[in-house]
Amino acid sequence: MTSKVYDPEQRKRMITGPQWWARCKQMNVLDSFINYYDSEKHAENAVIFLHGNAASSYLWRHVVPHIEPVARCIIPDLIGMGKSGKSGNGSYRLLDHYKYLTAWFELLNLPKKIIFVGHDWGACLAFHYSYEHQDKIKAIVHAESVVDVIESWDEWPDIEEDIALIKSEEGEKMVLENNFFVETMLPSKIMRKLEPEEFAAYLEPFKEKGEVRRPTLSWPREIPLVKGGKPDVVQIVRNYNAYLRASDDLPKMFIESDPGFFSNAIVEGAKKFPNTEFVKVKGLHFSQEDAPDEMGKYIKSFVERVLKNEQ
């Protein structure tokens, strides 16, 4: 296997964690607070970027500059992740994240309709919100996303044992003590080698052992398995999947990662959503780190077309 190497071009354009967080602001939400980036300009057109597991708003740092000339770009750190506060009850299930996210939306002075860009579990949150607030959604972009329930492990043979382990007591140790998702999974799902300062930005929120790492363990335990999964999550995914399959008037874009991690399986589900444009960028799971400019340009072009068609 070829060793990963640093990309000198990425070094030249590098944004460190402290530099990124300095651009962000914080807002009190319920019994905690949300840390977020807000470009503010073009407020009449808002695009909300949502990250997933093991990540933060930092993931989108090289993508959003492409979209900022045409829309207000807003990127939160999900509760308990990045620089956002901890949840009041110490729980980080899908519905906990959704509760804080929707309360935060109410405080943002958003336009009547928004565009979502969701990755990983961030796409799941975007889909769920879109299903529950169909009159507030202008378009959706998604990548490496949770598009449907998992009926059988035949669909995901490579990760069956991993998920069983994550759900066990050994999984608790693997994540809460050894920081599996941030220190092992995240860098393994990026093609290039992250600069030390970049990796430090992902690591910083989860440096301490124990409950601060709970969000990264809770997410994979939410995977919507029909047999053995959480019934409420399975129902949430069934609901938004049915809605998206019938959403002929809702523009969508699916960004496929090549060679990808989940993309090969997800693309078949995404094909069942009408009015979807398909594009492809290089990458494994976190293509924002391997092809940020390509991703940003695709999203900008899509957003521009959506806005033009509204006129």
Swiss-Prot record:
Domain AB hydrolase-1: 45-291
Keywords per UniProt: Decarboxylase, Luminescence, Lyase, Monooxygenase, Oxidoreductase, Photoprotein
Recorded effect of pH on activity: Optimum pH is 7.4.
Amino-acid biosynthesis is among the record's keywords: no
EC number: 1.13.12.5
GO biological process assignments: bioluminescence
The keyword Ion transport is assigned to this record: no
MF terms (GO), sorted A to Z: carboxy-lyase activity; Renilla-luciferin 2-monooxygenase activity
Catalytic activity: coelenterazine h + O2 = excited coelenteramide h monoanion + hnu + CO2 + H(+)
Temperature dependence: Optimum temperature is 32 degrees Celsius.
Protein residues bound to substrate: 162, 285
GO cellular component: membrane
Top-rank taxon, per record: Eukaryota
Subunit structure: Monomer.
Physiological role: Upon binding the substrate, the enzyme catalyzes an oxygenation, producing a very short-lived hydroperoxide that cyclizes into a dioxetanone structure, which collapses, releasing a CO(2) molecule. The spontaneous breakdown of the dioxetanone releases the energy (about 50 kcal/mole) that is necessary to generate the excited state of the coelenteramide product, which is the singlet form of the monoanion. In vivo the product undergoes the process of nonradiative energy transfer to an accessory protein, a green fluorescent protein (GFP), which results in green bioluminescence.
UniProt miscellaneous comment: This luciferase produces light with a wavelength of 480 nm. In presence of a green fluorescence protein (GFP) it produces a green fluorescence at 509 nm.
Protein name: Coelenterazine h 2-monooxygenase
